[in-house]
Amino acid sequence: MNTSYSQSTLRHNQVLIWLCVLSFFSVLNEMVLNVSLPDIANEFNKLPASANWVNTAFMLTFSIGTALYGKLSDQLGIKNLLLFGIMVNGLGSIIGFVGHSFFPILILARFIQGIGAAAFPALVMVVVARYIPKENRGKAFGLIGSLVAMGEGVGPAIGGMVAHYIHWSYLLLIPTATIITVPFLIKLLKKEERIRGHIDMAGIILMSAGIVFFMLFTTSYRFSFLIISILAFFIFVQHIRKAQDPFVDPELGKNVFFVIGTLCGGLIFGTVAGFVSMVPYMMKDVHHLSTAAIGSGIIFPGTMSVIIFGYIGGLLVDRKGSLYVLTIGSALLSSGFLIAAFFIDAAPWIMTIIVIFVFGGLSFTKTVISTVVSSSLKEKEAGAGMSLLNFTSFLSEGTGIAIVGGLLSIGFLDHRLLPIDVDHSTYLYSNMLILFAGIIVICWLVILNVYKRSRRHG
């Protein structure tokens, strides 16, 4: 009896170890190339609108994949999908490294990496629920969450060091480390019974087309792309109303509180992601810092602060309530952007503090947005609704990166608007920061109103 129990515990612990490895590298893959975007732009002689697709391509397939893998898990089995994700992620890494001298191949490789990496966040939580005993799940989720935060933290530092001292292309090989988990997962994960079901492939294709063409519009500003995107989304909406098992539940669209909360959350996440993608360009143009200095000295402290702010935010929600935390988070974000706009050419360490403010504000607002959205859902809508929120969060990050890249390239905001004496190289960035602050304030006011109304109706 004791031997059987100890063997079962050992098996669960081994599963948890390899899940932690996958979780860490999935986030690292997302963050590690961000600091190298200016280097990539210079090497290929590309504008930020094109160079940012190195991250946008990954986030696009990553966001769609996270939604798709969850729906496929019962039909194809978690074990098969995890192994598929690991191998595809590794394949994308090798293609990217071998063909890194050709920009189209690099973008293709990032699309492939996103397809593979999406399996990890989508399925890891399901594996914990199925394989880890109920009494240990809290610790398991906590450990995975800590490693995810660590991956977000060390990603920019690793990216900066490797890009500066070796070459950014070697960062593409980092995800291949997950291949070491394959033999252990094959041995540890049980074979599952498959459940027959229907996958709304038409809905997935229509929605993906709408997203891709909208992102292409934000980077090229060709209105033909916008028209195609609108048509694709229109057909998609008509489709999900008639489909037997639609990719997105159309009933969620009738929930005004849910829709507004999700859209505002997406705007905030996209704004912060766009800001983080802009920081390397800004620090190179204004302060002429190296990639290593930007990664470890500017972005790294902010990403690591997420661990502390996440804990503080959780305590404050319990003690002071969601509205209090929302206001503090929005204040940190908007004030951080405004201070950066007015002191953009001051000492670089000021930007380090601002990045800490921004990531702290993001931690606080993420908690509140999840609370607002979940409180607007009925019990039967909770699963589909929260999955759609996660999908929107990932997608908005990629969209934010694409939009910021487009704005940095067209020079629309490259004019002096603030009454301060600064160098011409700062005009574009300071105006972008003012725009970011405005978006945050508007979202704060809207979410505040939605939260109060949902509480009144709840």
Swiss-Prot record:
Native organism: Bacillus subtilis (strain 168)
NCBIfam families associated with the record: tet_MFS_L, tet_MFS_L_K_45
Cellular compartments annotated: Cell membrane
PANTHER family associated with the record: MAJOR FACILITATOR SUPERFAMILY, TETRACYCLINE RESISTANCE PROTEIN
Family: Belongs to the major facilitator superfamily. TCR/Tet family.
Domain of life: Bacteria
GO terms classed as biological process: proton transmembrane transport; response to antibiotic; transmembrane transport
Protein's recorded name: Tetracycline resistance protein
Disulphide bridges: none
Coiled coil (residue ranges): none
Transmembrane segments: 12-33, 81-100, 111-129, 140-162, 165-185, 201-221, 223-240, 256-276, 297-317, 324-344, 346-365, 432-451
Record-level GO cellular component terms: plasma membrane
UniProt KW Lyase keyword: no
Keywords, comma-separated and alphabetical: Antibiotic resistance, Antiport, Cell membrane, Hydrogen ion transport, Ion transport, Membrane, Transmembrane, Transmembrane helix, Transport
Lipid bilayer topology: Multi-pass membrane protein
Alphabetized GO MF terms: antiporter activity; transmembrane transporter activity
Function noted in UniProt: Resistance to tetracycline by an active tetracycline efflux. This is an energy-dependent process that decreases the accumulation of the antibiotic in whole cells. This protein functions as a metal-tetracycline/H(+) antiporter.
Secretion signal, residue range per the UniProt entry: none
Pfam families associated with the record: MFS_1
Main localisation: membrane
Keyword Transcription regulation: no
InterPro entries associated with the record: MFS (IPR011701), MFS_dom (IPR020846), MFS_trans_sf (IPR036259)
